[in-house]
Curated annotation (Swiss-Prot):
Organism: Corynebacterium kroppenstedtii (strain DSM 44385 / JCM 11950 / CIP 105744 / CCUG 35717)
Bias (Basic residues): 1-17
Annotated InterPro entries: Ribosomal_bL35 (IPR001706), Ribosomal_bL35-like (IPR021137), Ribosomal_bL35_CS (IPR018265), Ribosomal_bL35_sf (IPR037229)
GO biological process: translation
Signal peptide: none
Any one Gene Ontology molecular-function term assigned to this protein's record: structural constituent of ribosome
Region of interest (Disordered), residue spans: 1-64
GO CC field: cytosolic large ribosomal subunit
Gene behind this protein: rpmI
Keywords for the protein's UniProt record, in alphabetical order: Ribonucleoprotein, Ribosomal protein
Protein name: Large ribosomal subunit protein bL35
Ranges of biased composition (kind: Basic and acidic residues): 21-33
Amino acid sequence: MKQKTHSGIKKRIKKTGSGKLRREQANRRHLLEGKPSTRTRRLKGDTSVSRNDTKRVNRLLGEG
């Protein structure tokens, strides 16, 4: 049977042109009043998926 793409991963992770995986950082959605502004600034922007997780994420995306 054909493997299906994991729809949760599909929504959260984007593949760059060079093949790296980009994801948004956690802890910046809600309850931001209690968090220091330095922390929320640091959590801005995307970060890459760790090397340990890339194989698993690629499999969930249906690649390899």
